[in-house]
Amino acid sequence: MKREILLERIDKLKQLMPWYVLEYYQSKLAVPYSFTTLYEYLKEYDRFFSWVLESGISNADKISDIPLSVLENMSKKDMESFILYLRERPLLNANTTKQGVSQTTINRTLSALSSLYKYLTEEVENDQGEPYFYRNVMKKVSTKKKKETLAARAENIKQKLFLGDETAGFLTYIDQEHPQQLSNRALSSFNKNKERDLAIIALLLASGVRLSEAVNLDLRDLNLKMMVIDVTRKGGKRDSVNVAAFAKPYLENYLAIRNQRYKTEKTDTALFLTLYRGVPNRIDASSVEKMVAKYSEDFKVRVTPHKLRHTLATRLYDATKSQVLVSHQLGHASTQVTDLYTHIVNDEQKNALDSL
């Protein structure tokens, strides 16, 4: 989604929200949470507060008038009723054969509400330096996670990774083979952003950074000589991330054409740009998602930018057998998250079975 459109949609949702949600928004913007994350959270709050009005929990005339006391006095039974409402409401699910939204969607909704409740009961301060209230009903609400072993998840993900020679093969395909399949009109469009697209995908494959971290990079964040980028991690923490050498020529090619191709001014600090009505803008996450999906589907299998992050992590673990190194590369505080990659590259169990 274009940044301008995203901000417009955020503003429309903010106009609907109660004052305490607007305070929450400002607080998280200062962390900083990304606009995309905050937009998704505001959509969840709109859904929740609409239900609060429909169910009669509040007799307010509109969402913005719902008092803080409604959240303070929300019972566990009320919140469970909301969850049942999500499960049973077919209009929320594009698949009409199902009766409600998926568990993943419900978990996302509850995560957004948990964040709001934590802010109201722990983080915010009133005039006396105390939170607005103390009772956090979300701590009493349990969520159901998808039941799947690490081995099963690893096997599923492995089919969508570009491991071994496929990493270089994917980049070569975009650079040399993909253009041969295009019509003259499509080729002209492809050539306008070829260097940029290759640079973005090479960077994702060579660093393992999150999509949001990549699109928010500024020119000053890239040290091409040292092959290091400075990113803003989740929670607003700054981090320096090493980039594999194979990405360097792609980044150099893009930088060589960036200013002229995208008509930049000194004020255009974003590393990766797109032209909108002749004006350079920072490329947005949805554009990168569509780009990765298009190229990857033509090459092998349709994947998301996050699978490119998994690809780098798996290759790095395969080369080093160090979960600590992989966790540092990905910006994780714990090695627990990297357990997945040990299962993806673990051939010992299969070899043992084959020898029986």
Swiss-Prot record:
Paired cysteines (S-S): none
InterPro entries linked: CB (IPR044068), DNA_brk_join_enz (IPR011010), Integrase-like_cat_sf (IPR013762), Integrase_catalytic (IPR002104), Integrase_recombinase_N (IPR010998), Integrase_SAM-like_N (IPR004107), Recomb_XerS (IPR023670), Tyrosine_recombinase_XerCD (IPR050090)
Domain Core-binding (CB): 16-121
CC terms in the record's Gene Ontology section: cytoplasm
Keyword DNA-binding: yes
GO molecular function, one term: tyrosine-based site-specific recombinase activity
Regulation: FtsK is required for recombination.
Active-site residue numbers: R210, K234, H306, R309, H332, Y341 (o-(3'-phospho-dna)-tyrosine intermediate)
UniProt keyword annotations, A-Z: Cell cycle, Cell division, Chromosome partition, Cytoplasm, DNA integration, DNA recombination, DNA-binding
UniProt keyword DNA-binding, yes or no: yes
Compartment(s) where it occurs, according to its Swiss-Prot or TrEMBL record: Cytoplasm
Record-linked NCBIfam families: PRK05084.1 (NF003462)
Described purpose of this protein according to its UniProt entry: Site-specific tyrosine recombinase, which acts by catalyzing the cutting and rejoining of the recombining DNA molecules. Essential to convert dimers of the bacterial chromosome into monomers to permit their segregation at cell division.
Protein's recorded name: Tyrosine recombinase XerS
Organism: Streptococcus pneumoniae (strain P1031)
The gene coding this protein: xerS
